[in-house]
């Protein structure tokens, strides 16, 4: 819970980045601060692992180091999101407004590059971490991690990008965000009845209120477009999942194991990066709602093999073609894995397009919070569906109905939002 708190109050960091320059800088200075905090976290973890930091117990040092890493990451993430909206000019050299389609396409390509960099970094760390851990001790591995903030510092030195937008600090966002974080922490630690529902309701109320504050100065047409954009993003991200029942079933009935699931995850991650690169043109040049529509359709179609496996599809394919459940799962993971990554591009493009001058970091942070709240809505739906279709370890009689229900909801809700509001964004 503690490590998720900085992400929960991300709008606080966004407000600071938007309105509080440090040494005259609202971008580069915060990147340096984030890098410094990250470096401190690495040093604390190295000291805890190596035993040369003794001012606190090792477990407390690990928590402190991890918290510093998260804070540094959040600060740099907030700045990067704001800069991703600023790098594309909205006006040509003559001062005329550029065509919206061109701006959207370029913003989309920026998001593609950002996601590619993030995915490549995750794959690189996953590949190197095990190898480094086999050669060096833990303290040395953490010290090698100082390369990461060093790259940020080099970027600040080489690229002198800076915003000239200035506005006063909005204490409603800053104070409200901190109070919101405290309330979420109290609900999470206090074992309150219906705690998840309470957190969801409070989050929606706070985020929607802050979005109204941030967009208050915009014209009515733009505010309506932002509202419809928010509804589409929420609907697309709020799809329920099956829960643990299907995973248990694959272990108990199909006899999948940890090694096979590791292969599935590695295959999915690599193919997601490749698909993001291959489909970058379609993701950025077609309309956002068109891309989201077809991604929702594809997600539904690619859910069918999982349903088929439950009803014996693998037995038929084994008899007819010679390949069974593992082959179907591997092919399905390879084809379905890019969808989550691909769907982020049009969603982030919509957010970047409507980022308001002077509120870019705060806006992006609030919309990221909205997407996270949508995931909570999906988790609540998952919980309720599992109460209707009860699936326990070893009792999978209702798993088929649960799979069908989640697939239908995952299709109808986003498609309905796109059909109703897609033409207005």
PLM segments and residue spans:
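Intracellular loop-helix junctions on the cytosolic face of multi-pass helical membrane proteins
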Residues: 49-64, 75, 87-242, 256, ...
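Glycine-rich segments within core transmembrane alpha-helices of 12-TM secondary carriers
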Residues: 7-10, 38, 98-126, 268, ...
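Membrane-interface helix-entry/capping residues at the boundaries of transmembrane alpha-helices
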Residues: 17, 31, 97, 105-107, ...
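Intracellular juxtamembrane helix-capping segments at the cytosolic ends
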Residues: 75-95, 342-356, 362
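A late C-terminal transmembrane helix in Major Facilitator Superfamily
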Residues: 357-390
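Short extramembrane helix-to-coil loop segments that connect adjacent transmembrane helices in Major
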Residues: 1, 251-260, 392-395
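Helix-to-loop junctions at the C-terminal end of transmembrane segments
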Residues: 7-25, 133, 274-294, 386, ...
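C-terminal ends and interior cores of transmembrane alpha-helices
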Residues: 32-57, 297-322
